[in-house]
Amino acid sequence: MSADALSLPFAAPHAAPDEITAVSWNLHKGRSPLGFTAWNAMRNWMQSTHADVYFLQEAMARRMPRPVLAPGFGAQMMDDAVDDVWHCQATEIAHALDWQIALGPNVFKPSWRHGNAILSPHPLDLGGRWDISAHRFERRGLLVARATLAGARPVTLLCAHLALTRAARLRQMHWIAHWIVRNAGDGPLMLAGDFNDWRNDSVALFGEIGLSEVATLLGESGRTFPAFSPALALDKMFVRGLTPLEWRAPSGEAAWLSDHLPYIARLRLDSQ
C-alpha cells in the first residue's frame, strides 16, 4: 500500500505557520473491518498525512511473554522479577517517528489493554487521564495533554471515547464540559474522539461552552462509520480558538483499515 494512495492533498508537511492538521481515528484495536491485522497499514497511513496532532481511540497494547533462555545459554541469569514486555501500537509509531505521545488506557486485561492516545511531532505536556466511565460495563476515559503548535501557541488537547448508550454519553459529555470550564482556561482547545453520537447531542451541548464542531460548522456530513460505507457521524472534533478550514474523511484504501474512517481537519489558529 503506497503512501501516495493514502496521502491527503491538504496534509502537507509545510503548511502555513498558523495552520494545523488534526486527525481523530478509532483504530479498532489495529484490526480491519474484516478482522485482519491492519496495524502496519495504519502506521503507514499516519506517516503519510504529516498531521500536527493525532487523537487515537482503541489503541491496543498486548503483553508479550518474557524471553526464555535455553539451559547453557544464560538461563541461570534470568531474574524471575523481570517484567513481561508490552507491545503498544501507539508507542511503536511514536518511537519510530520520534513523536511525542500521551497514553490513557481505559480497559485493563491480564494480556491486553486499550484506550486513548495523543501523538504529535510537536512538544507535548501531559495532563493525565480522567475516568469518565458511566458504569462498570464500559470503561471510558478523557486523555488530556497540551501541545505547542503553530508558532509556539499552547493548545489544550482532549481525546475521548464515549459510551454506546445515549444516557451514559450525555453524562460523560456533561462531565467533560465541566472539566473544560473548570480546568482548560480560555486558550485554544481541541476535543476529539469517537463520541458514538449519531444524534449530534454533543454539538449543542459543547456549543453552550463555546466549542464548535468542525464538520458541522463547515456544513459537512461528518460521517465516518462504517468505514466502507459511511452513514453515521460518530466521530467529532470540537475546537475553540481555531477556525475550521476543511474537513475530510478519506475513502479508497483507508476504508479497509478500521471500522471507522479517520476524521481529518485543517484548522487555522486564531490570532491572539
Predicted regions and their residues:
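Active-site beta-strand/loop signature of hydrolases that rely on acidic residues for catalysis
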Residues: 21-27, 45-81, 119, 145, ...
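Beta-strand-turn-beta hairpins that frame and shape the catalytic cleft
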Residues: 10-22, 114-116, 120-125, 138-159, ...
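Surface-exposed cleft-lining segments at the edges of enzyme active sites
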Residues: 28-33, 77, 129-134, 159-167
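N-terminal, active-site-proximal structural segment of metallo-dependent hydrolase catalytic domains
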Residues: 1-96, 103, 108-113, 270-272
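Catalytic-core segment of enzymes that process non-peptidic bonds
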Residues: 96-132
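Metal-dependent phosphoester-hydrolase catalytic domains
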Residues: 1-11, 124, 146, 174, ...
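Solvent-exposed loop/turn segments connecting transmembrane beta-strands
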Residues: 110-111, 135-139, 166-168, 255-257
